[in-house]
Every structure is written in structure tokens, then in C-alpha cells.
Amino acid sequence: MPVCAGYCFTSIIADEEMSSEITEQELATARKIWGDALVAISKSFENEGIDAAREVANYALDTAYGFDLGQVLFKPTMAGGEQTFRTTREGALAYFVGHTDEYPGDSGFGIKGWRSVVSETAASFVDGDVAMWMGWVTFIDKDGGITKVDKSWGYKKDEAGTLRIVLHHSSLPYQPE
């Protein structure tokens, strides 16, 4: 069993007979796993503190993201200035759990008490072992508060057939005045 402070979630592992072509079902499963990981990060923080949350977030980054494939394009919802785009794994980790001097503006999106994450597809594009998805992701916190963001993910299957996030872009919906 993976080390994840007791708040594990399933990662996508393809079997040997799976096609290299990414399916819509795999995209849906990847979004569900990502949401489950975010909830696991929140619960580990609430129950065991920042070190446990960091452990779960590291596991999520290792299993869901493609940092071992090359540059992951990561743009968090609430980021700006010189740190708008996170070009390193450390930058992505800081966004999820905060508590780092290198990213003082990050309060830790993953430790906001999330209880549910639901995605709604606007469109997806699949070309073999690469896929892109965009839509809305709704987060519900422990008090019933709702946050809805515009989200895009890009995925690539690695050599083992595991779907990995290589693009993560999130923004708040446009609010006309």
C-alpha cells in the first residue's frame, strides 16, 4: 500500500491489454481520482496536520501528474505575478498545501476543507495517448460552501499506460460588472 497518511486514493494503472488511445471513461476516472486526492489532502490536514497533508499531496503529484515525463504546465486558480505559472513540482506542491517560504502567497488550496469535487465536461479532445479536457469543477467544503472554477487538464499516457496530467489550468469564472 502506498504511503499516504491513511488517506489514500486510487491512481489510474492501465493493464497490459489496454489501448494507447485514451478513452472518455479514462478521462472521467482521472478527474474523479484527482478530486478524491484533493479531499484526501483536506482531511489529512484537518486530522493530522500539515506534514500529513504534504505526504498525501506528494503522493497525488507522484501518481496523477507527469513530472517524470517532462515539464508539467501548471497554472493554479489563485496565483499571480511572478508565481502565476508553476513550472516545478515544488510550485505545484506549494499550491496544494501552502506553508512554504518560496511561495508566500499560497495558503494551500488543498487544505480548505474540501468534501466533494464534481466535474462537468464542456469538451474534450483525444489524439492517441494525448488528451485535453475542459469544463467546470465544483468544490464543496465541510460547511457546504461551493466554489466553481473553469478548468483545463491535458493528459498523456506514460510507457506503463498510466494516464498522467501534463497540463493543469484553473481560473475563476468571468464575473461581468
Q: Where do the PLM segments sit?
A:
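A solvent-exposed, acidic/Ser-Thr-rich amphipathic alpha-helical stretch
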Residues: 32, 44-123
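Amphipathic alpha-helices that form helix-helix packing interfaces
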Residues: 34-37
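N-terminal amphipathic/basic-hydrophobic helices that include classical n-h-c signal peptides
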Residues: 1-17
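Short beta-strand edge/turn micro-motifs at domain boundaries
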Residues: 126-134, 138, 142-177
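Intrinsically disordered, low-complexity, compositionally biased regions/tails
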Residues: 10, 74, 123-126, 139
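Short, charged low-complexity linear motifs
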Residues: 19-21, 120
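Membrane-proximal amphipathic alpha-helices
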Residues: 23-27
